[in-house]
Swiss-Prot record:
Name by which UniProt lists this protein: Na(+)/H(+) exchange regulatory cofactor-like protein nrfl-1
Gene: nrfl-1
Source organism: Caenorhabditis elegans
Subcellular location: Cell projection, Microvillus membrane; Apical cell membrane
Primary localisation category: membrane
Entry keyword set: Cell membrane, Cell projection, Membrane, Repeat
Length: 467
């Protein structure tokens, strides 16, 4: 690369753009043999003046192409290639002398080219590129490093050139080397393998730089926003301030979240606590046993009557009433009153009469004497006081002496075989005119006094049935 002293006048890259409604660039183009193409008169406040053209400037390149040795007609064609915009590399007559004397061609590859803002109306002054800023720039060109694995691979992108605008990245192959390096469609190439690229750089030259190494290439590319930022702030591109792309493989880490939902049933609008998922709910089926008790009712008549007994079965639920833990006989008897699900069954057996009254009497569990009771009448025992029991014992002795006589009617019209009470129509020991509660209380008291725990099973049944 040619070393150019800093005091040498640099060439200027002037961008001439027409604004809305403008039809001319506002300058004249002259050609002289031995001088080449140069700028004639420049109209004030014209696109040419705003672009930095000065009368007498020599023209060395137009829209990225060198015009050295080209005729006037060819140069005009290049200028008119874009009717609204034109880039020209120019230098003053005095400034060109040093290059002629030192045999240095003025081309777009010179390192000291100065870019002129299109909106500037002042004569441009060369300012060396500023040092890299300490703070990160908001817009940086991207450094894309493309490396092939084998010679038969492709970089995976297309190169497009637009006259007067530069070289751009076209289609980028998905998953290719170019995409992995960070290339995107629409980026402008501003550098190739360490060398800056300008809009005036020839297309063949850019292609040659890319193919310089068949296995790898390094591109400096700028998106539309980055390019606009550099133009607006008159910032030259540099290989020192770049955005690097991390080409290391990305490891995708997937995190699986397992959420187990346990539905909680509701009962009557209230939340039920959730069950342990490891617990087992067991529905215990309880078998209800049945217990059957048999109660025998005996009826004893005289020797001429048939001996009858009734046997009834009562079935009740063993779990309906808990067992009575009491030594009181009456509690055990009345503890089974009003049992649910009680079924009654009965049958009557008639036994043939016997001549031996003593054998008949021995079958009875009653302590009272036998009396004449009609067959259709149900015998219900009643219990009298101690004096009444003595009277019955006397009556029993009387019956033994007259067992062959005809039985006489019951006294006082009592159908139970006992005399009725002489006061208020009821005997004090008669419990059948009392309520069930009063009867139980009176019998409980009598049991304590007269040891009624010797009652037969028949008497207990009759007593319970009449409650």
């Amino acid at each position: 690369m040619v070393h150019i002293p800093s005091d040498v006048t640099p060439p200027r890259l002037c961008v001439v753009e027409k604004l809305n409604g403008e039809n001319e660039y506002g300058y004249n183009l002259h050609a002289e043999k031995g001088r080449g193409q140069f700028v004639g008169t420049v109209d004030p406040d014209s696109p040419a003046e705003r672009g930095g053209l000065i009368t007498g400037d020599r023209i060395f390149a137009v829209n990225g192409h060198s015009i050295i040795g080209e005729n006037h007609k060819k140069v005009v064609e290049r200028i008119k290639a874009n009717p609204n915009r034109c880039e020209m590399l120019v230098i003053s007559e005095e400034g060109a002398k040093w290059y002629n004397e030192n045999n240095v061609q003025i081309t777009l590859d010179l390192p000291n080219i100065e870019r002129v803002s299109p909106m500037s109306k002042e004569t441009p002054v060369f300012v060396p590129p500023p040092p890299p800023p300490t703070d990160a720039m908001p817009y940086l060109p991207r450094l894309a490093e493309l490396n092939k694995g084998t010679p038969d691979q492709e970089f995976g992108f297309n190169l497009h050139a637009e006259r007067g605008r530069g070289h751009f990245i076209g289609t980028v192959d998905a998953g290719g080397i170019g995409e992995k390096a960070g290339l995107e469609a629409g980026q402008r190439i501003v550098g190739v393998n360490g060398q800056l690229i300008y809009p005036t750089t020839g297309h063949k030259e850019v292609v040659a730089l890319i193919k310089k190494d068949t296995m790898k290439t390094t591109l400096l590319v700028a998106s539309e926003d980055v390019d606009k930022y550099h133009k607006d702030h008159n910032i030259a591109y540099s290989w020192d301030n770049v955005e690097r792309v991390d080409t290391r493989p990305v490891i995708n880490v997937e995190t699986h979240h397992h959420h187990e939902e346990v539905s909680v049933p509701k009962s009557n609008g209230y939340d039920v606590p959730p069950l342990n998922p490891h617990s087992i709910q067991v529905n215990e089926e309880r078998e209800i046993s049945k217990m059957t008790t048999t109660t025998r009712t005996e009826t004893i008549t005289n020797s001429n009557s048939a001996y009858q007994y009734k046997e009834s079965s009562t079935a009740y639920d063993a779990y309906a009433t808990p067992p009575v833990d009491s030594n009181d006989l009456m509690d055990e008897v009345f503890g089974r009153v009003n049992l649910p699900g009680v079924t009654m069954s009965s049958h009557t057996e008639v036994l043939p009469p016997t001549d031996d009254i003593s054998s008949v009497s021995s079958l009875s569990s009653h302590r009272e004497s036998a009396v004449d009771v009609p067959v259709s009448h149900q015998y219900v025992p009643s219990y009298a006081t101690e004096s009444h029991q003595k009277h019955e014992q006397h009556s029993q002795t009387h019956h033994h002496h007259h067992q062959h006589q005809q039985p006489s009617p019951l006294s006082n019209g009592s159908s139970h075989g006992y005399a009725a009470s002489s006061t208020s129509g009821y005997d004090d020991d008669d419990i059948y005119h009392l309520s069930a509660r009063e009867a139980r209380e009176r019998l409980r008291m009598k049991n304590r006094k007269h040891h009624l725990h010797e009652m037969s099973l028949n008497e207990k049944y009759q007593l319970v049935s009449n409650m």
